[in-house]
Each structure stands twice: as C-alpha cells, then as structure tokens.
A protein has these predicted regions:
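Residues that define the loop-to-transmembrane-helix transition and helix capping
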Residues: 2, 15, 51-55, 85, ...
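Membrane-interfacial helix termini and adjacent extracytoplasmic/periplasmic loops
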Residues: 3-4, 20-62, 96, 132-135
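Hydrophobic transmembrane alpha-helices
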Residues: 7-14, 27, 58-66, 116-123, ...
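Transmembrane alpha-helices
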Residues: 10, 14, 63, 70-73, ...
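Juxtamembrane/transmembrane-helix interface segments of polytopic membrane transporters
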Residues: 20-32, 36, 75, 109, ...
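Membrane-cytosol interface at the C-terminal ends of specific transmembrane alpha-helices
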Residues: 47-89, 114-115
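C-terminal transmembrane helix and the adjacent membrane-cytosol boundary/short C-terminal tail
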Residues: 74-89, 93, 97-101, 116-117, ...
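Interhelical loop and adjacent transmembrane-helix boundary motif
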Residues: 123, 129-172
C-alpha cells in the first residue's frame, strides 16, 4: 500500500497544467483512433469524442486528487484491526454483515472527510479545469479568474468568497472531527 500511496501522491505534486497536457495527449490520440475507426465503419465523421468533455475533466481530477482521498481513507482503514474481523467472525457474522456493522461505521467519517476535501479541491482547481473544460462549462474558479482578468474585481469577489467559505467550512469540519477523535 505505501507504493500505491507514493504513486498516487505524484498527481498532487505535479502542476494542474502538466496533468491537463498529460490527459489531453492520450485522449487526443484515442479520439483520432475512434474517429478513424468510426469513419471507416460507419462512414461518418465524428470529430473529437472525449477531448473537451466532462469525462476528460473527471479523469484529470481523479489523477490530480487521488492522493487526497487515498490518504484520508487510508487513515480510516488504519482504525480497523484484524482482531475486529476475528471478533465479528466469532460472533457468527457473515463478511457482508461485518462490512455493514463494523467497517462501514468506522470508515464513514473518513469517507465523508475525503469527499469533502476532494470537493473543495475540485472547486478551486483552475489550471486543469481551464485546459480541459467543455465550452460554456465555467466553474467558480474559472468565473473568478475571468472576472479578475477583465479587472472586474468587485464582481470577482463573489465567486472567490464562495470558494473561500466552502474551503473554510471544510477545514472547520475536518478540524472538529480531528479533535473529537483525539478526545475519545
């Protein structure tokens, strides 16, 4: 598992623009292969099918933010010990019941924190979103950037403030969870 964590953390260490290019190149080649095959098989020109779609954007987010989610969930998995599984098995529970009654309640806070942290990172991600977004698909970060670029700073304040407020709420939630866990 440490090797997977180290490999996944590369996405967070590499700039978003580099990840965007790293996603665009293979998707462009795949688009060209699909377009050639569809033109040969069906006789229609399709153009780009994957590049500039939400699927490409989600893939870039997955590469970029896997480390955030993986480390948070890994911390939750550390709470589950083999003795818990042994105890559940000795009480006659099936593996599915053990998952539902033991693992899921212990992992729920970590999964919620991971989802929240990834949501906040997606909300503020600009370089990969800017390069890979479909036309007329503006996130808060892109809207704030476009308004600030046009020197409409008063208008750029609203989307920027929403990004900061959501980030602050996430930090407060995770901090509260951390202090509750250390007290118990």
């Amino acid at each position: 598992m440490p090797a997977i964590n180290r490999f996944a953390s590369l996405g967070y260490a590499i700039p978003g623009a580099v990840i965007a290019v790293g996603v665009l190149v293979p998707l462009g080649r795949l688009d060209n292969l699909l377009a050639g095959w569809l033109e040969q098989a069906l006789g229609t020109k399709t153009g780009l099918l994957l590049t500039g779609t939400v699927a490409a954007l989600v893939y870039a987010y997955l590469v970029r933010l896997l480390a955030v989610a993986l480390q948070t969930v890994d911390a939750g998995l550390a709470k589950i010990t083999p003795s818990m599984d042994d105890a559940a098995r000795s009480l006659g529970t099936s593996p599915i019941q053990t998952l539902a009654r033991v693992h899921a309640p212990l992992l729920a806070p970590s999964l919620a924190a991971a989802a929240l942290l990834v949501f906040v990172d997606v909300l503020k991600e600009l370089p990969a979103t800017f390069a890979l977004r479909p036309f007329n698909f503006d996130t808060l970060a892109i809207e704030a950037y476009n308004l600030a670029k046009d020197e409409r700073l008063a208008e750029a304040a609203a989307p920027s403030l929403v990004i900061v407020a959501v980030g602050l709420l996430a930090v407060l939630f995770v901090t509260k969870r951390y202090f509750q866990a250390t007290r118990s």
